[in-house]
Amino acid sequence: MEIAGKAVCVFLLLAIIKLRRSEGINRVSANLGHNTVMTCPTRTNISMVTWKINPKTGHQCTLAYRIDKDSTGKTNCSDRINWRSRPDWDQALEIQQVGKADEGNYTCEVVNADGNFHRLYHLTVIVAPRMALYCDDYGNPVCEAETEKSAAEISWVPESNSTPRADSHDNGTVTVVSWFAARSTNGKNPTCIVSHATLNETKSINCSSSYRDLILCIAIILSFLIIITFMAVIYYLKLHGCRFCHRSKPPDIIPTYSSQDDTVEVEPYTTYVQKENVIYNSVSDLTLRQNLPQGQSPAT
C-alpha cells in the first residue's frame, strides 16, 4: 500500500508538471521613462493567454485573451500597460514610460491542448544617473545630479560656500542642486564634482563671459526698442499734433440788422401815439362843451 501511494503521488506530480510547465524566473531591467517588452512562451493552437502582474506596490493587474471568443479583458491595469499588438498573433506585453511603481513580478500563462505554460519575469527599474552643469540668470554656475536614493554628493573646485539642496521625487529619485558661491576663482573655471554609487563625473564651466554676453544682448535690444519708440512718437506728433497748432482762429461774427426789423419795431410805437392823441382830443372836446353856457357851441 505504501508503494502504491507513492506511485500515485508521483503520477499526480508528473501530471501537474505536464499541465503547468513553467520556466525559471527571467530577470529584466528597464530604464526609468523608457518602454519595455516581455514575451510569452511560444506555443501553437493557443486557446487562452493571460498576463498576471504583481507590482511591489499597488494591486494585481490582469490581461486576458480568449481565442475562441476573440475577446480581451483588462483588470486594474493602467493605460501604459497593454498588449504590444493584436493578442491573436502577438501575445507580448508592453509597458510604456516605465516607472518605479512598475517593479515586480510578471507572469504570462499560455493554454493549449498540451497544458498550461508559464513564463515568469522580475522587472527592475533602473534610474540612470544624470548630471547637469549650467549658468543661471545671474551668471552663477549651478550643478545638478539626479540619482536613485541615496542622494549624490556635490563638491566644487575652488571650494564653494553654498549648501546643496536635495529634492525627493515620487519615482524614487533624488535631485541635488548646488550653486557655486566662492568669492574668487583665481582665474580658473569652477568645477563640479558629483560622487555616487552609480555616478562619478566632473565638469567645468565658465559663466562670466556668457553672462556678459547676455547683458550686452539685452542692452542692445532695449536701446533699439527705445529708439524705435522715440521715432514713432515724433512721427505721430508731426502727423497729427501740428494740425492743432496751425488751426486759424474763427472770425468774429458781427450781428446784422435789416431796415425791415426797424420798421417792424417803429410801427407799433407810431400806432400807439396816434391812439393817444385821438383819446386826448375827445376828452378835451367833452370838457369844453360842459363848461360853455347853454345855447353856445364850441368854436371850431
From Swiss-Prot:
Domain named Ig-like V-type: residues: 25-124
Disulfide bonds listed in the record: 40-108, 143-192
Stretches assigned to the Ig-like C2-type domain: 122-206
SUPFAM superfamilies linked to this entry: Immunoglobulin (SSF48726)
The name this protein goes by in its record: Cell surface glycoprotein CD200 receptor 1-A
Any one Gene Ontology BP term: regulation of neuroinflammatory response
GO cellular component: external side of plasma membrane; extracellular region
Ranges in the topological domain labelled Extracellular: 25-213
Superkingdom, taxonomy of origin: Eukaryota
Annotated coiled-coil segments of the chain: none
Cleavable signal peptide: 1-24
Pfam families according to UniProt: V-set
Bilayer-spanning residue ranges: 214-234
Tissue expression as described in the entry: Highly expressed in macrophages, peripheral blood lymphocytes (PBL) and peripheral blood mononuclear cells (PBMC). Weakly expressed in bursa, thymus, spleen, liver and brain.
UniProt entry keywords in alphabetical sequence: Disulfide bond, Glycoprotein, Immunoglobulin domain, Membrane, Phosphoprotein, Receptor, Repeat, Secreted, Signal, Transmembrane, Transmembrane helix
Organism: Gallus gallus (Chicken)
Cross-referenced InterPro entries: CD200R (IPR040012), Ig-like_dom (IPR007110), Ig-like_dom_sf (IPR036179), Ig-like_fold (IPR013783), Ig_sub (IPR003599), Ig_sub2 (IPR003598), Ig_V-set (IPR013106)
A GO MF term: signaling receptor activity
Glycosylation sites: 45, 76, 105, 171, 200, 206
Post-translational modification (record): Glycosylated.
Matching PROSITE patterns: IG_LIKE
Stated family: Belongs to the CD200R family.
Cytoplasmic topology ranges: 235-300
